[in-house]
């Protein structure tokens, strides 16, 4: 059976921790979308890993990168080297149909953002958006193209001829890359990962047909989806969990979907954020939650939990249980607020409507008492402070979905499973 982990906010909800946690009982973990524009951090004891290409697991498992994923070769190789260095003897399978995010894409991305000025999206500048453009325009470079250096040269020359003109003459920047160096580096990295090449759709399809469990890791999050998110302040692809079937290449089927959410809201980059805090409360949350980008290292914008968005994300993805993270971060505040509805021009609006004009939406809040500093270990829900239990109960009632997992620290073991 398929189990999928999906983010219900703007990313950085803690999906990596729950992929790692759930992988303790599932041998096959697959990543099917996104690229190195977002990282998932996992920690077990003194071992800490950050993954933006490989599935986020510190367990010895079968790891699959499916054809919908976008590959930054130096980062992928670095992650492979990390798990080998730490003696995490996972078996890695990479689909050769994955498209490559080139240094040229990153340079184009940065030039585009600079050119847009105040209209910029706030991209981390990895180049994923430009890679998606090339894939859609049918002149992208895939992993399979790295085998033959002369074939790779021909494809890169064509792509270079288009993108260099765009950088120099459209965005008024100056392309600074060395073509021959990019060609050689891409070819050598391709040779390095060639032993892992596999048609992952066939393996995963066979596993599911034989009754095996497969855990899916969704990159980014619901409201960064370029159709249902806060467009245009989104990523360049779809992030809803049901896109997995096309991105992997398997038939649609039943899934067990775990929605991951933080106990507050964060956002990286530009875009509307109705519950954003600009007070010392934001600094308190940011420092206690270490809210700095895994990839960009930029300070994340912080705000109160927005349950209108969470409930909408639950419906969009078909979530059947929730995992909530960072409840320890809110401990010690005088009070905690939760947005339960929106007003625009003094009229209540539904979430779909609000998302079209979220910069104008005024949140309506419910206020909760905070709780004291949490312990280092819990075994039962009743051991938690009553104020936290009230907070969690309200989330369950509002969303209509049970909270199954409560994370109260970064370590894998700092997770309470609600029975």
Swiss-Prot record:
Q: Which Pfam families match?
A: Adenylsucc_synt
GO MF terms, alphabetically ordered: adenylosuccinate synthase activity; GTP binding; magnesium ion binding
Q: Gene Ontology terms, cellular component aspect?
A: cytoplasm
Instruction: Give the highest taxon in the source lineage.
Output: Bacteria
What residues bind IMP, as annotated?
Answer: 12-15, 37-40, 138, 220, 298
Query: How is its cofactor bound, per UniProt?
Result: Binds 1 Mg(2+) ion per subunit.
Identify the metabolic or biological route this protein is part of.
Answer: Purine metabolism; AMP biosynthesis via de novo pathway; AMP from IMP: step 1/2
* UniProt binding sites for GTP: 11-17, 300, 326-328, 407-409
Instruction: Name where it's found.
Output: Cytoplasm
Q: Which residues form the active site?
A: 12 (proton acceptor), 40 (proton donor)
Which InterPro entries does the record cross-reference, listed alphabetically?
Answer: Adenylosuccin_syn_GTP-bd, Adenylosuccinate_synth_dom1, Adenylosuccinate_synth_dom2, Adenylosuccinate_synth_dom3, Adenylosuccinate_synthetase, P-loop_NTPase
Q: Which residues are involved in binding substrate?
A: 294-300
Q: Name the needed cofactors.
A: Mg(2+)
Chief subcellular site? cytoplasm
State the EC number(s): 6.3.4.4
Top-level EC class: ligase
Single GO BP term: 'de novo' AMP biosynthetic process
Catalysed reaction, written as an equation: IMP + L-aspartate + GTP = N(6)-(1,2-dicarboxyethyl)-AMP + GDP + phosphate + 2 H(+)
Keywords attached to this Swiss-Prot or TrEMBL record, sorted alphabetically, are: Cytoplasm, GTP-binding, Ligase, Magnesium, Metal-binding, Nucleotide-binding, Purine biosynthesis
Q: Which residues bind Mg(2+)?
A: 12, 39
Q: Which family does it belong to?
A: Belongs to the adenylosuccinate synthetase family.
Report the function annotation for this chain: Plays an important role in the de novo pathway of purine nucleotide biosynthesis. Catalyzes the first committed step in the biosynthesis of AMP from IMP.
- Kindly state the subunit structure of this protein: Homodimer.
Q: What is this protein called?
A: Adenylosuccinate synthetase 1
